[in-house]
């Protein structure tokens, strides 16, 4: 597997673009991904029960088949909690995109992100979709078109050889606030020219989402709009992937790398964030316990504010472990911050405070927890909690 310079349109047969339709003041706010042939597809969605209209429309597209040829996305407006009219507007986005690209209606996925409760300005949406062209575009413009409070574009591309063919996989994501997936306010789109059955792609996506996107948190809020969509159009012409083979393992590793990079990028770009926090939990009896404990630690407001202030207060970490719901032995926990052991057998060690203080000034803080009761592990990612987070969200609509 090789990291390559690319974008969401790098896999063979894909195109992407973004335009300014006027939903936002300056930046691009409507974008699309298009495959020149129908692609096997998979998707996962927010677990928030107040799901936005685009979620229902995309689910409807998947009802008749697991194929997509286009994804239409707008930012600046979530089209959530907008009643029957919001549903009609999302359906209209799908229909207009299908007509413009001359593809079947159910080959189009719809995604929206932005302010909840406002009606879509359909005159602007319609004008934006009319700018669509089948096989032209600038992928960087698409990356910008899906952003809201993000401070940078998030994308990655890898290549590997499968069945004697070069296979490319690219991913792009947005997300900065309201991030606490199962899923959260994040959109992620992954394209690949690999040939893989849709059922296997869906199974793999769920496994990898649980390891990556569902292990990030910024503020504990789960959004109404999140989705991850994967399109595999087979244009690399590799032999159809089969589970349990060496080629499938290579594909799965590449999938993991793409999704982990995007997940960490979202956590790093949390609203107002100055530091990425990574929590690694080892020695658990179950993977689920390790992941649960890691995520509780990285979700703790007290841990997040300590990271912001450069305070190595391990009491906040052990407290989060205690209420995590995961299994552990209270008298046998080891905690390291940046490789510096500060807790052993659940008692404070003698450590170099100056070295710890210096480490906590870095932009990537790693907390290692060993439970010493098993062999399973899990990782979660988040960010610190700064004054800027409050400022951004206190004035979001203004």
Curated annotation (Swiss-Prot):
Residues forming the catalytic site: 185
Major subcellular location class: cytoplasm
Any one GO cellular component localisation term in the record: cytoplasm
Keywords, comma-separated and alphabetical: Acyltransferase, Amino-acid biosynthesis, Arginine biosynthesis, Autocatalytic cleavage, Cytoplasm, Multifunctional enzyme, Transferase
Residues marked Involved in the stabilization of negative charge on the oxyanion by the formation of the oxyanion hole (site): 113-114
Location(s) in or outside the cell: Cytoplasm
Family statement drawn from the similarity comment of this UniProt entry: Belongs to the ArgJ family.
Residues the record lists as binding substrate: 148, 174, 185, 271, 393, 398
Taxonomy, superkingdom: Bacteria
Short name of any one Pfam family annotated for the protein: ArgJ
Protein's recorded name: Arginine biosynthesis bifunctional protein ArgJ
CDD domains xref list: OAT
Catalytic function, reaction form: N(2)-acetyl-L-ornithine + L-glutamate = N-acetyl-L-glutamate + L-ornithine; L-glutamate + acetyl-CoA = N-acetyl-L-glutamate + CoA + H(+)
Biological function: Catalyzes two activities which are involved in the cyclic version of arginine biosynthesis: the synthesis of N-acetylglutamate from glutamate and acetyl-CoA as the acetyl donor, and of ornithine by transacetylation between N(2)-acetylornithine and glutamate.
Site label Cleavage, positions: 184-185
EC number: 2.3.1.35, 2.3.1.1
SUPFAM superfamilies for the chain: DmpA/ArgJ-like
GO-annotated biological processes: L-arginine biosynthetic process; ornithine biosynthetic process
Listed pathway(s): Amino-acid biosynthesis; L-arginine biosynthesis; L-ornithine and N-acetyl-L-glutamate from L-glutamate and N(2)-acetyl-L-ornithine (cyclic): step 1/1; Amino-acid biosynthesis; L-arginine biosynthesis; N(2)-acetyl-L-ornithine from L-glutamate: step 1/4
Gene Ontology MF terms: glutamate N-acetyltransferase activity; L-glutamate N-acetyltransferase activity
Quaternary organization: Heterotetramer of two alpha and two beta chains.
């Amino acid at each position: 597997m090789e990291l390559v310079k690319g974008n969401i349109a790098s896999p063979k047969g894909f195109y992407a673009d973004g335009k300014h339709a006027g939903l936002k003041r300056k930046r691009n706010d409507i974008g699309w991904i298009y495959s020149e042939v129908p692609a096997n597809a998979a998707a996962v969605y927010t677990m928030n029960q107040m799901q936005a209209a685009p979620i229902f429309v995309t689910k409807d597209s998947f009802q008749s088949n697991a194929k997509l040829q286009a994804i239409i996305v707008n930012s600046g407006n979530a089209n959530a909690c907008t009643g029957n009219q919001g549903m009609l507007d999302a359906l209209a986005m799908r229909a207009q995109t299908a007509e413009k690209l001359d593809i079947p209606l159910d080959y189009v996925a719809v995604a929206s992100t932005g302010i909840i409760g406002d009606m879509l300005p359909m005159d602007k949406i319609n004008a934006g979709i009319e700018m669509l062209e089948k096989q032209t575009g600038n992928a960087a413009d698409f990356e910008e078109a899906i952003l809201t409070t993000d401070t940078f574009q998030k994308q990655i591309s890898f290549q590997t050889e499968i069945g004697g063919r070069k296979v490319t996989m690219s991913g792009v994501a947005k997300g900065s606030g309201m991030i606490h997936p199962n899923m959260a306010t994040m959109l992620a789109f992954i394209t690949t020219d690999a040939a893989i059955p849709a059922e296997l792609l869906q199974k793999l996506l769920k496994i990898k989402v649980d390891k990556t996107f569902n292990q990030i948190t910024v503020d504990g809020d789960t959004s109404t709009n999140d989705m991850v969509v994967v399109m595999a159009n087979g244009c690399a012409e590799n032999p159809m992937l089969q589970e349990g083979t060496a080629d499938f393992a290579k594909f799965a590793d590449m999938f993991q790398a793409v999704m982990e990079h995007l997940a960490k990028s979202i956590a790093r770009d949390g609203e107002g964030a100055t530091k990425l926090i990574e929590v690694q939990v080892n020695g658990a009896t179950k993977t689920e316990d390790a992941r649960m404990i890691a995520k509780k630690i990285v979700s703790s407001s007290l841990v997040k504010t300590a990271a912001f202030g450069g305070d190595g207060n391990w009491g906040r970490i052990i407290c989060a472990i205690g209420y995590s719901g995961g299994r552990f032995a209270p008298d046998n926990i080891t905690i390291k911050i940046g490789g510096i052991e500060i807790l052993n057998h659940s008692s404070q060690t003698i450590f170099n405070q100056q070295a710890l203080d210096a480490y906590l000034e870095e932009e990537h803080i790693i907390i290692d927890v060993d439970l010493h009761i098993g062999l399973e592990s899990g990782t979660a990612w988040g960010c610190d909690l700064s004054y800027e987070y409050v400022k951004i969200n206190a004035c979001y609509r203004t």
